[in-house]
């Protein structure tokens, strides 16, 4: 089942989870870091050194027309946030309705290639954020931003994104782990280790349903796009 809109898109088959029905994920892809030329949508990118090996160039992201579309969308968000939020609200609502009409559970990932604190963005109709507006939609993201105010938001799951670029960022990794967050790690080789950071490693490339992962695990992801050549510490060699 496919879903296309101006902000979020879903393609491919819904993922079947035994005993829990089917899920379909819609993702919003913006231009990460400073690629839009008008703002920084990944505030921790330089500290974590992930801007050069960003997964933005993986898959269809390698095509110029895809990058141009992400830049246009990002500039829209940065220049006219009100109209962008109104459109995003409409698109989430349409996606939600289509999923329910087809007996599928809707999942939305707003930070496909960005790291924005969506918990701080009020929805045009007055809701505190999209998570409050759509309690029957499951949201999730990866993040490198510490101390995000998401405690108590039951339908928003965050996974911490690892980098060993420097000690300061590693301190944030340790804090995230102590806070009980799962840790996503990009490995250069697809043969993931059994354990990393004293956590068992699961294969995060098998599906995108991070909110269903067990607690206290490392989510292994294979390096894609520009990340294949990364030497900053963002991508891990075993």
Sequence positions of predicted segments:
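Class I S-adenosyl-L-methionine
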Residues: 1-238
